Amino acid sequence: MADNADDLFQIPKNFYKEGSHFIKRCVKPDRKEFLSISKAVATGFVLMGLIGYIIKLIHIPINKVLVGGA
């Protein structure tokens, strides 16, 4: 019975200890790394937007031909 209670309290203790150790190891990116990540994310957003816009431009005339302009 005591082993079950110890195990029950040991799991959150280990979780807290591992979590706090992980947070201590994490470091903020420097300015150069932050700018490179931001550029990559912005490029991805722009490319995905352009792809969606091009697909929409192609889809509208095809839809009008197939549906008959309804």
Curated annotation (Swiss-Prot):
GO terms for molecular function: protein transmembrane transporter activity. SUPFAM superfamilies: Preprotein translocase SecE subunit. It is found in: Endoplasmic reticulum membrane. Residues 1-33 are cytoplasmic. GO terms for cellular component: endoplasmic reticulum; Sec61 translocon complex; Ssh1 translocon complex. Residues 63-70 are extracellular. HAMAP family: SecE (MF_00422). Heterotrimeric complex composed of SEC61-alpha, SEC61-beta and SEC61-gamma. This is Probable protein transport protein Sec61 subunit gamma. It comes from Schizosaccharomyces pombe (strain 972 / ATCC 24843).
